[in-house]
A protein has these predicted regions:
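Right-hand nucleic-acid polymerase module
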Residues: 1-108, 118-200
């Protein structure tokens, strides 16, 4: 995944004369919050593309009745993930997951989403039986760049950020460090010239 962008930042090459960053003074503005959300979405898109293939399971698990409190939801979610790990160990695979809990503080019922590698149909039934508080719906992840971006956008959408827990990722996910390269002024120009309309 390659991203090219222009930067208006101009910094001296010498570390001695670089201006130090000022201490944080103001609360994050709405504009900056949106910038932060987009960065989280881009990072999550890369993580999804690097760890999941087409056919991976996108699981949504719901509550038939609204739970008593947030702590109960977190405890039941943790128990569900422990069961998932056991199912995957028995299948000879690692449970590599990305998950989020939605509507923890909202008026509706909480529910969770988790992206995890696919197993067999029998294993899918075991996973559905492991969640004893409501329905378990399984959809297949498409595997393309647009699929990853759409899923990352949903996981990081403003509604989830405002009324839910943080995105959780398993420790065994592959995380290739981002490689940044500085593009010179000459390299930033278009390689092929495009004549104005009406000219050849």
């Amino acid at each position: 995944m390659v991203k090219k962008y222009y930067s208006y930042r101009a910094l001296p090459t010498s570390k001695k004369v670089r201006e130090k960053r000022a201490k944080r003074q103001n609360v994050t503005t709405a504009t900056q919050a949106e910038v932060n959300r987009r960065l989280r979405m881009e990072n999550l898109t890369r993580l999804i593309m690097e760890n999941y293939e087409a056919g991976a399971w996108y699981i949504t698990y719901t509550y038939s009745e609204k739970p008593t409190d947030e702590k109960a939801v977190l405890a039941e979610d943790a128990k569900f993930k422990r069961t998932l790990r056991r199912i995957y160990r028995r299948a000879g695979m690692e449970a590599r997951y990305i998950s989020v809990l939605e509507n923890l503080k909202g008026r509706g019922r909480p529910h969770g989403h988790i992206l995890i590698p696919a197993l067999t149909v029998d294993d899918m039934e075991r996973i559905q039986k492991a969640w004893k508080h409501g329905r378990v719906q399984v959809k297949l992840y498409g595997g393309g760049a647009e699929d990853a971006a759409r899923m990352a956008a949903y996981f990081t959408k403003e509604k989830i950020d405002g009324s839910s827990g943080r995105i959780q990722t398993s420790r065994n996910l592959t995380r290739t460090p981002v490689k940044k390269e500085r593009v010179t002024r000459s390299e930033a120009y278009r390689e092929e010239s495009t004549p104005p309309r009406g000219y050849r």
